[in-house]
Amino acid sequence: MTDLFSSPDHTLDALGLRCPEPVMMVRKTVRNMQPGETLLIIADDPATTRDIPGFCTFMEHELVAKETDELPYRYLIRKSG
Protein backbone atom coordinates (compact mmCIF):
# COMPACT_ATOMS: atom_id res chain seq x y z
CA MET A 1 0.00 0.00 0.00
CA THR A 2 1.31 3.44 -0.95
CA ASP A 3 1.63 6.09 1.74
CA LEU A 4 -0.18 9.09 0.24
CA PHE A 5 1.66 11.38 2.64
CA SER A 6 5.17 10.31 1.57
CA SER A 7 5.85 12.61 -1.39
CA PRO A 8 3.88 15.88 -1.30
CA ASP A 9 4.92 18.81 -3.46
CA HIS A 10 4.80 21.13 -0.43
CA THR A 11 4.73 20.67 3.35
CA LEU A 12 3.29 23.01 5.98
CA ASP A 13 4.19 22.53 9.64
CA ALA A 14 1.38 24.07 11.71
CA LEU A 15 2.31 22.35 14.98
CA GLY A 16 1.68 24.56 17.99
CA LEU A 17 -0.52 26.99 16.06
CA ARG A 18 -4.12 27.60 17.06
CA CYS A 19 -7.22 28.62 15.12
CA PRO A 20 -7.33 30.56 12.86
CA GLU A 21 -3.58 30.46 12.13
CA PRO A 22 -3.36 26.99 10.51
CA VAL A 23 -6.05 27.69 7.93
CA MET A 24 -4.63 31.15 7.22
CA MET A 25 -1.24 29.56 6.54
CA VAL A 26 -2.83 26.87 4.35
CA ARG A 27 -4.61 29.51 2.31
CA LYS A 28 -1.41 31.52 1.83
CA THR A 29 0.58 28.43 0.85
CA VAL A 30 -2.04 27.10 -1.58
CA ARG A 31 -2.25 30.51 -3.25
CA ASN A 32 1.41 30.14 -4.29
CA MET A 33 1.01 26.56 -5.59
CA GLN A 34 0.26 25.38 -9.12
CA PRO A 35 -3.00 23.53 -9.88
CA GLY A 36 -2.61 19.81 -9.24
CA GLU A 37 0.20 20.22 -6.69
CA THR A 38 -0.24 18.68 -3.25
CA LEU A 39 0.26 20.11 0.22
CA LEU A 40 0.90 18.06 3.34
CA ILE A 41 -0.31 19.84 6.47
CA ILE A 42 0.90 18.67 9.88
CA ALA A 43 -1.08 20.13 12.77
CA ASP A 44 -2.10 19.51 16.37
CA ASP A 45 -4.98 21.97 16.79
CA PRO A 46 -8.26 20.02 17.18
CA ALA A 47 -10.05 22.76 15.22
CA THR A 48 -8.18 21.68 12.08
CA THR A 49 -10.27 18.49 11.97
CA ARG A 50 -13.17 20.75 11.00
CA ASP A 51 -11.37 23.72 9.44
CA ILE A 52 -9.14 21.98 6.88
CA PRO A 53 -11.95 19.88 5.30
CA GLY A 54 -14.17 22.99 5.36
CA PHE A 55 -11.48 25.04 3.64
CA CYS A 56 -11.14 22.40 0.92
CA THR A 57 -14.89 22.29 0.32
CA PHE A 58 -15.26 26.07 0.26
CA MET A 59 -12.25 26.64 -2.03
CA GLU A 60 -13.00 23.53 -4.14
CA HIS A 61 -9.65 21.84 -3.46
CA GLU A 62 -9.43 18.07 -3.06
CA LEU A 63 -8.86 16.61 0.39
CA VAL A 64 -6.86 13.60 -0.81
CA ALA A 65 -6.25 12.06 2.60
CA LYS A 66 -6.43 12.80 6.30
CA GLU A 67 -5.25 11.12 9.49
CA THR A 68 -6.89 12.49 12.61
CA ASP A 69 -6.96 9.49 14.93
CA GLU A 70 -3.83 10.60 16.79
CA LEU A 71 -1.48 13.57 17.00
CA PRO A 72 -0.06 15.04 14.95
CA TYR A 73 -2.91 15.27 12.50
CA ARG A 74 -1.98 14.99 8.82
CA TYR A 75 -3.91 16.28 5.83
CA LEU A 76 -3.04 16.06 2.14
CA ILE A 77 -4.79 18.45 -0.20
CA ARG A 78 -4.53 18.94 -3.96
CA LYS A 79 -4.99 22.40 -5.40
CA SER A 80 -7.84 22.65 -7.87
CA GLY A 81 -7.28 23.97 -11.35
Swiss-Prot record:
- Indicate whether Glycoprotein appears among the record's keywords: no
Keyword check for Translocase? no
**Which cell locations does it reside in?**
Cytoplasm
Instruction: Name the UniProt key words of this record, in alphabetical order.
Output: Cytoplasm, tRNA processing
GO-annotated biological processes: tRNA wobble position uridine thiolation
This entry carries the following GO cellular component terms, namely:
cytoplasm
Source organism's superkingdom?
Bacteria
Gene Ontology MF: a single term: sulfur carrier activity
What InterPro entries does the entry give? Sulphur_carrier_TusA, TusA-like, TusA-like_sf
Q: Which residues form the active site?
A: 19 (cysteine persulfide intermediate)
Q: In which pathway does it act?
A: tRNA modification
Of which family is this protein a member?
Answer: Belongs to the sulfur carrier protein TusA family.
Quaternary structure, from the entry? Interacts with IscS.
PANTHER family found in the cross-reference section? SULFUR CARRIER PROTEIN TUSA (PTHR33279:SF2), SULFUR CARRIER PROTEIN YEDF-RELATED (PTHR33279)
The protein's job, in short, is:
Sulfur carrier protein involved in sulfur trafficking in the cell. Part of a sulfur-relay system required for 2-thiolation during synthesis of 2-thiouridine of the modified wobble base 5-methylaminomethyl-2-thiouridine (mnm(5)s(2)U) in tRNA. Interacts with IscS and stimulates its cysteine desulfurase activity. Accepts an activated sulfur from IscS, which is then transferred to TusD, and thus determines the direction of sulfur flow from IscS to 2-thiouridine formation. Also appears to be involved in sulfur transfer for the biosynthesis of molybdopterin.
What name does the UniProt record give this protein? Sulfur carrier protein TusA
Q: Which organism is it from?
A: Escherichia coli O17:K52:H18 (strain UMN026 / ExPEC)
